[in-house]
């Protein structure tokens, strides 16, 4: 017990937690006060690129490690190249920050540097009389081993899984008493306590209790829901908040869509409106791959109703959406009235006349809902064949209603994909007023940037089916690239997507265009508006930079591409409607 008591006292000493994001160390130096700078982030150590590296940045490192100042700020891997990721680049400190993580930079994992540019420092030998022996990094593992031993306990936890077998785990009140998150357990009077958990959460109970000892836990797609549930039930607020933030990270990682659907059901059961909205948003942006997954047929009716009501639902076309609903209905237990309500959400005016005619032959839903289909088809045909001014005058249609507005249609009719390979093989450069062409790769840092030229109809109405408008979409990572393509940009807003149209469009038609951020080639993790001719590109990961992060982090650290979607609509207040 003396050993346990000493460990518990150690836990109470300030600064005895394990390594955390932003911690720094010096590696490969000839003495303790010099070396390659490494910084900790998300469970691993990485290096810092020497771009903009100077003595102010080095001072931050040295002072954080107990030295008075830095004497040298070195680059070009002066202490040898490191291994692992390059965590930070273009670091700019004032010299007073507690860590490089608090300085201005490109953000975590945004560098394109190689390890030949790893930054290093030499710190002064003066430590102001302070000498630190810090072995606290070993403490979490040692306390975890005490839990694993299941010996010397004074608290016995009976875990019941609601008819699926019980589990008895012993714990140590003295250790639990040092952790405010374990208050629900250490405040128990007596030597035993009962934990009632769902049967599906039994496998993670031991990890949950061990977390109170080591203050470290691995959270996966399969465990996040149960850990969030246990943390909520037992007041482990830090773990609860962490899991809550992690939901957004985990949603894009499951191509089967089982995790988003399970989390949606969990959010409804616990009345967690924030998590519910998060799941609905992710599934709306990724509606197309959802309809192609096996999980599509198990989507709840209420969730499908919520999805179909959204304008920011991404799908190839409204016809493909209707076909997916038709397929879903064949396996669903939804009532006739529930299916009718779903069909009311379909935007029939966004389906072309020929496709509307063919619905009666191609949809299993048609016969059971013939009256609705005929009514919706007639309304859609009026939209396609009658000029806007006549519709507004004689029908009194409110063309601002959702049914007359396009969603995020990702087919080639209404969108284009911009990736690193989506440009022409040659780049044009203006030299003395003449266009000269260079092969792919010419001075790529200055002149070559991904772009796409494409055409779309001016409007979804069949009246405009042959009236095309030309667009150019460009990825703009630098101020120079903005100048090259005729845009005005500030360094703070970069990178951005640029979008221009190069042909005439009807004055009665406006555009609310969108940019979809793609991760891993298939998941949409964020959507940005084109304000004028530019759409901001968020950070792919949640970083310490001032730039906004994507709603759903992209685990690779970079977007795989961008889909530009054109969304025309009638300007109902236009004075020129002919």
Curated annotation (Swiss-Prot):
Whether Cytoplasm counts among this entry's keywords is no
Q: Does the keyword Glycosyltransferase apply?
A: no
Q: Residue ranges of the SRCR domain?
A: 24-124
Using the UniProt record, give the first listed, main subcellular location: secreted
What residue range is the signal peptide? 1-18
Example GO BP: cell adhesion
Listed as disulfide-bonded, the cysteine pairs are: 49-113, 62-123, 93-103
Keyword terms: Cell adhesion, Disulfide bond, Extracellular matrix, Glycoprotein, Secreted, Signal
Start and end residues of each BACK domain: 260-360
Database matches in Gene3D superfamilies: 1.25.40.420, Potassium Channel Kv1.1, Chain A, SRCR-like domain
Q: Where in the cell is it found?
A: Secreted; Secreted, Extracellular space, Extracellular matrix
Glycan attachment points: 69, 102, 362, 398
Q: Where is the BTB domain?
A: 153-221
SMART domains given in the database record:
BACK, BTB, SR
Q: Which GO terms describe its cellular component?
A: extracellular matrix; extracellular space; membrane
Pfam families assigned to the protein according to its UniProt record, in alphabetical order: BACK (PF07707), SRCR (PF00530)
In terms of domain of life, where is this protein from? Eukaryota
The free-text function statement in the UniProt record for this protein reads: Promotes integrin-mediated cell adhesion. May stimulate host defense against viruses and tumor cells.
The subunit structure is: Homodimers and homomultimers. The multimers form ring-like structures with a diameter of 30-40 nm. Binds LGALS1 and LGALS3. Binds ITGB1, COL4A1, COL5A1, COL6A1, FN1 and NID. The unglycosylated form interacts with PDE4DIP; this interaction, which is PDE4DIP isoform-specific, may connect a pericentrosomal complex to the gamma-tubulin ring complex (gamma-TuRC) to promote microtubule assembly and acetylation.
* Protein name per its UniProtKB record: Galectin-3-binding protein
């Amino acid at each position: 017990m003396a050993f346990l008591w000493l460990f518990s006292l150690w836990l109470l000493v300030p600064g005895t937690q394990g390594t955390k994001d932003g911690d720094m160390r010096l590696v490969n130096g000839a003495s303790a006060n010099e070396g390659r700078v490494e910084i900790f982030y998300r469970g691993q150590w990485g290096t810092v690129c020497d771009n903009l590296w100077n003595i102010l940045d080095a001072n931050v490192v040295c002072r954080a490690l107990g030295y008075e100042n830095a004497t040298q700020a070195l680059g070009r891997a002066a202490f040898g190249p490191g291994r692992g990721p390059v965590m930070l680049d273009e670091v700019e400190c004032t010299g007073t920050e507690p860590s490089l993580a608090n300085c201005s930079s490109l953000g975590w994992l945004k560098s394109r540097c190689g390890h030949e540019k790893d930054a290093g420092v030499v710190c002064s030998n003066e430590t102001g009389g302070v000498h630190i022996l810090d072995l606290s990094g070993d403490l979490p593992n040692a306390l975890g081993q005490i839990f694993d031993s299941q010996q010397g306990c004074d608290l016995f936890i009976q875990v019941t899984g609601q008819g699926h077998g019980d589990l008895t785990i012993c714990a140590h009140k003295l250790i639990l008493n040092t952790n405010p998150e374990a208050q629900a357990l250490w405040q128990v009077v007596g030597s035993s306590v009962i934990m009632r958990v769902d049967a599906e959460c039994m496998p993670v109970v031991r990890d949950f209790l061990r977390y109170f000892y080591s203050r470290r836990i691995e959270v996966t797609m399969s465990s996040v829901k149960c850990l969030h549930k246990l943390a909520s039930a037992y007041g482990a607020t830090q773990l609860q908040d962490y899991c809550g933030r992690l939901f957004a990270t985990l949603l894009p990682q499951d191509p089967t869509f089982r995790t988003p659907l399970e989390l949606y059901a969990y959010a409804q059961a616990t009345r967690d409106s924030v998590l519910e909205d998060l799941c609905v948003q992710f599934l709306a942006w990724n509606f197309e791959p959802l309809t192609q997954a096996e999980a599509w047929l198990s989507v709840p009716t209420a969730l499908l109703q919520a999805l179909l009501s959204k304008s920011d639902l991404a799908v190839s076309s409204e016809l493909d959406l209707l076909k997916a609903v038709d397929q879903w209905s064949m396996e669903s237990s939804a009532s006739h009235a529930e299916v009718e309500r779903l069909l009311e959400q379909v935007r029939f005016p966004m389906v072309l006349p020929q496709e509307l005619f063919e619905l009666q032959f191609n949809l299993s839903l048609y016969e059971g809902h013939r009256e609705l289909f005929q009514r919706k088809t007639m309304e859609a045909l009026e939209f396609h064949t009658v000029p806007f001014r006549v519709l507004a005058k004689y029908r009194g249609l409110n063309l601002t209603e959702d049914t007359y507005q396009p969603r995020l249609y990702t087919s080639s009719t209404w969108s284009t994909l911009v990736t690193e390979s989506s440009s022409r093989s040659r780049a044009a450069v203006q030299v003395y007023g003449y266009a000269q062409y260079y092969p792919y790769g010419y001075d790529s840092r200055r002149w070559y940037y991904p772009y796409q030229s494409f055409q779309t109809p001016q409007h979804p109405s069949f009246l405009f089916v042959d009236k095309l408008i030309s667009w150019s979409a460009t990825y703009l990572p630098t101020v120079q690239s903005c100048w090259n393509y005729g845009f005005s940009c500030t360094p703070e807003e970069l990178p951005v997507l640029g979008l221009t149209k190069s042909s005439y469009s009807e004055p009665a038609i406006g555009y609310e265009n969108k940019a979809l951020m793609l991760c891993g080639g298939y998941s949409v993790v964020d959507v940005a508006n084109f304000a004028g001719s530019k759409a901001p590109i968020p950070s792919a990961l949640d970083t310490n930079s001032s730039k906004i992060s994507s709603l759903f982090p992209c685990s690779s650290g970079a977007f795989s591409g961008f889909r530009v979607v054109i969304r025309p609509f009638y300007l109902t207040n236009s004075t020129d409607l002919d």
